[in-house]
Amino acid sequence: MTTLAEFLPQHLQQHALPDQLGGVLQSVVDACVQINRQVRLGALAGVLGEAGSGNVQGEDQKKLDVIANDVLIAALKANADVAGLASEEEDTFVPCHEEGRYLVLFDPLDGSSNIDVNISVGTIFSILTKPQGALATESFLQKGRDQAASGYVLY
């Protein structure tokens, strides 16, 4: 069996992709491991139910929505290769590192309305190369075919 830690460097080298992309992917994976732990613990960790706040779409946030969002933001802000991020749970993008070369967009907990009935949820993410110039909303508005990487992590 090949682990992700073994696969990523080989894949990046085989396809002449920058090592920094692997680092950003690893940051997403590390955050998802933490989110998975919270999802599995559920009621035992006291993380089920409403958070008492809403997101930008006007949806009621679940406690796990907020936790997953905070975990992903912290993990990505810690990576110097991340220039900025955009989350479904935030009003606007979050700038990270001026010299970073990647943007990460995500829904931290897709399907969170399913949490209380024990149906699968997940994290959707997309990694884009940051365009030249100052970080702006338009930086995140790129064609899907221009993604450096994307994925769905199922919990």
Task: Label each PLM-derived region with a short phrase.
Residues 1-109:
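N-terminal subdomain of lithium-sensitive/metallo-dependent phosphomonoesterases centered on the IMPase/IPPase/PAP
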Residues 100-155:
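DPxDG-like acidic metal-binding loop motif
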